[in-house]
């Protein structure tokens, strides 16, 4: 298997400790840039008009363990039952607000929760008809739900 980066994400977060636990926490959400490499600019055709995008990106080192203990919960949980960044395949996913282009190959986005310079793997339009599940449940996270999503 081979993954190819298509660009980089530019955020105000210089270290993992600077990153919010999720991109919905900072209010207001800081502006960020998804910079797409020139070889992939043609893939951005007709992206205008979408209010939200799904960004997939590479988070960095792989996990040592398949279980983690969330700081707000205190109970061990399987990594696949969490949104923890340390994973067997550290692929991150964010639904971001798309605020238009900031120049050729530069997308203005908000609600990212990754370190500046994170490799961008893919961009998909967020589609209300297929990406939102009105009846979705939150499993063990339900008691930790806040006004801005899971803790």
Task: Locate the predicted segments by residue.
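Cys-His-centered catalytic/binding microenvironment captured across papain-like cysteine peptidases
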Residues: 1-93, 100-151
């Amino acid at each position: 298997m081979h993954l190819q980066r298509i660009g980089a994400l530019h955020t105000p977060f210089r270290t993992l400790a600077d990153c919010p636990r999720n991109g919905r926490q900072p209010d207001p959400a800081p502006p960020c840039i998804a910079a797409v490499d020139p070889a992939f600019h043609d893939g951005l055709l007709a992206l205008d008009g979408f209010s939200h995008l799904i960004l997939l990106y590479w988070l960095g080192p792989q996990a040592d363990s398949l279980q983690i203990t969330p700081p707000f919960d205190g109970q061990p949980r399987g990594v696949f039952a969490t949104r923890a960044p340390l994973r067997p395949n550290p692929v991150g996913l964010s639904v971001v607000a798309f605020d238009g282009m900031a120049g050729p190959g530069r997308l203005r986005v908000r609600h990212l929760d990754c370190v500046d310079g994170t490799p961008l793997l893919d961009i998909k339009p967020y589609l209300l008809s297929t990406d939102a599940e009105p009846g979705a449940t939150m499993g063990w996270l339900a008691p930790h739900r806040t006004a801005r999503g899971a803790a």
